Regions:
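Short acidic-glycine-tyrosine-enriched beta hairpin
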Residues: 62-111
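Short beta-strand His + acidic residue motifs that chelate non-heme Fe in jelly-roll/DSBH
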Residues: 58-59, 115-120
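A short hydrophobic beta-strand segment most commonly corresponding to one strand
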Residues: 122-138
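Long hydrophobic alpha-helical segments typical of transmembrane helices together
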Residues: 141-172
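Hydrophobic/aromatic beta-strand patches that form the interior of the parallel beta-sheet core
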Residues: 48, 107-108, 125-127
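A short, N-terminal "cap"/entry segment at the start of jelly-roll beta-barrel domains
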Residues: 1-26
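Short, conserved beta-strand element in jelly-roll/cupin
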Residues: 42-58, 62, 129
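Conserved short histidine dyad/triad with adjacent acidic residue
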Residues: 22-42, 59-65, 111
């Protein structure tokens, strides 16, 4: 499926509260991602990510009274869609740290850590192990107060031909 954050995601294993997923980051998203103003988010799961190809930059943020004001969206999932709903809440956040991870490296992140991740290369391939910690609504932040109270992103399936074409370009 195409993920709202601009990569392709394939769940290989789902057992109890854990998943193993493949993520493929491509320089050509064809507009198949949500607004760049909606990239800071957190998760309801802890995860470990292994970088198999390419490089990623992960930037973490923390809540701080001296930070920049961001508007808070809650996330819910219906069928194959992610639905962001603006809340009445806002947060002030500051940059905590940025880290670059390259092929052969791995990193871990806890649930509820505000962050954004981007590929630094034309293509990146990662394996992600997640473990659900709680079921609350994942948070998404925006520094722009949009007039849209609800934003819907359909996680469309990637057809087999398109996926095969992308995977045959990978060289390990």
């Amino acid at each position: 499926k195409v993920h709202p954050l601009g990569f392709y995601s394939c769940t290989l294993l789902h057992e109890n509260n854990q998943k193993i997923r493949l993520h493929y980051w491509d320089s050509i998203t064809n507009g198949e991602q949500q607004s760049s103003e909606l990239m800071i988010h957190d998760h309801i799961f802890d995860f470990k990510s292994w970088i198999m190809l390419g490089a990623l930059e992960n930037t973490e943020y923390e809540v701080s009274d001296e930070g920049e004001l961001y508007y808070l969206y809650s996330t819910k999932y219906e069928n194959d869609s992610s639905i962001l709903k603006i809340t009445e809440d806002s947060l002030k956040i500051t940059h905590k740290n940025s880290s670059i991870y390259t092929q052969g490296m791995s990193y871990v992140m806890g649930a509820n850590v505000l962050h954004k991740t981007r590929s630094l290369t034309d293509r990146a391939f990662t394996i992600l192990h997640t473990q659900d910690m709680e079921y609350t609504s994942p948070r998404v932040l925006s520094n722009t107060n949009t007039s849209e109270s609800e934003i819907i992103f359909h996680r469309k399936d990637v057809n087999e031909h398109e996926l095969l074409k992308k995977l045959t370009t990978l060289v390990f």
